[in-house]
Each structure stands twice: as structure tokens, then as C-alpha cells.
Amino acid sequence: MAKRTANNIKPGELNLKEKLVHINRTAKVVKGGKRFGFNAIVVVGDKEGHVGFGLGKANEVQDAIAKGVEDGKKNVIKVPIVKGTIPHQIIARYGSAKVMMKPATPGTGLIAGGAVRAVLEMAGIHDILAKSLGSSNPHNVVKAAISGLESISDAYDVAERRSKSLKEVFES
């Protein structure tokens, strides 16, 4: 399966919005006391099927967020959306974080929590049931959600892989 990676998506042509998922403060003990640094996880997306995430580190919060946004624009993927939801159920893992996503009927809404919700909102998915299992570490949950969305196959992908027409795929 060919992955929908940032190689064929030009982020400059997209109207990307950003959503902050998590900020972490780190401390380095030096001779004069503690020196604080920050890292930020940011999800970017156009709410029309493109989503990516980035991690930024800096001595100031705003700089960390800006670096996260720039990093996120480099990692944008295309997500197949069918009638406001995903084509099929997926379970994705990254480390000990596990994310389960199920398609939902129109009108259900976005039922997800925490970091998964931010990813799905930025992707533009309106009707979905999602659950984060295992680790609640926002880094790993975001990476699991993105890898799950990246692994989704729509009917066109399946037809291409099987060297069949779209009609033959639906009949089999």
C-alpha cells in the first residue's frame, strides 16, 4: 500500500489551522539554579482531510509552539473521508498507546477525548467513535492516531492494489 505522506502534499497550498495538544515544562539544574525549557505538541490540519503533527522545543512557550507548527506542516498526510467519517474501523498502536476508531452514522458527532479529538478535528472528521486505550501519553496517542489514519484504505486503494475495477471490489 502506498502511504499518503507529505511528499506529494504541498502545505503552502493548504489553509492549515493549528491546535495545541500539550505543553511540557522541563527543568535543567545548573550552577545558578534551574533553567526551564518547554516542548509543545501541535496538530495542524485544514479540516478537509489533511492533518499532521509536530513537536517543538524552545526556552519560551510561544517559540516552542511556532516550531511545532512548522514541524507539523512538514508531516501532513491525506486522510480518506467518506460522508464525514472513516471508511472502516481501525486499531492503531504506537508504543504502549492504542487508539481505536470506528466509523459512525451522520449526526453522531465526534466522540473522542484528549489528543485523539484534536487530531480528528483537524482532519475534518465529523462523525466517529474513538477511544484511547493503554498509555495516555499525548506524544504516543497522537502518533498512534496519525498512524491509524495513515493506514486507512478506501475503496479506490483496495481496487488499485487488487488490480480490479471499483465495481468488482464492491461485488466481491
From Swiss-Prot:
It comes from Chlorobium phaeobacteroides (strain BS1). It comes from the Bacteria. SUPFAM superfamilies: dsRNA-binding domain-like, Ribosomal protein S5 domain 2-like. Part of the 30S ribosomal subunit. Contacts proteins S4 and S8. The keyword rRNA-binding applies. Residues 16-79 form the S5 DRBM domain. This is Small ribosomal subunit protein uS5. Belongs to the universal ribosomal protein uS5 family. GO terms for molecular function: rRNA binding; structural constituent of ribosome. The keyword Ribosomal protein applies. With S4 and S12 plays an important role in translational accuracy. Located at the back of the 30S subunit body where it stabilizes the conformation of the head with respect to the body. GO terms for cellular component: small ribosomal subunit. The N-terminal domain interacts with the head of the 30S subunit; the C-terminal domain interacts with the body and contacts protein S4. The interaction surface between S4 and S5 is involved in control of translational fidelity. Keywords: Ribonucleoprotein, Ribosomal protein, RNA-binding, rRNA-binding. GO terms for biological process: translation.
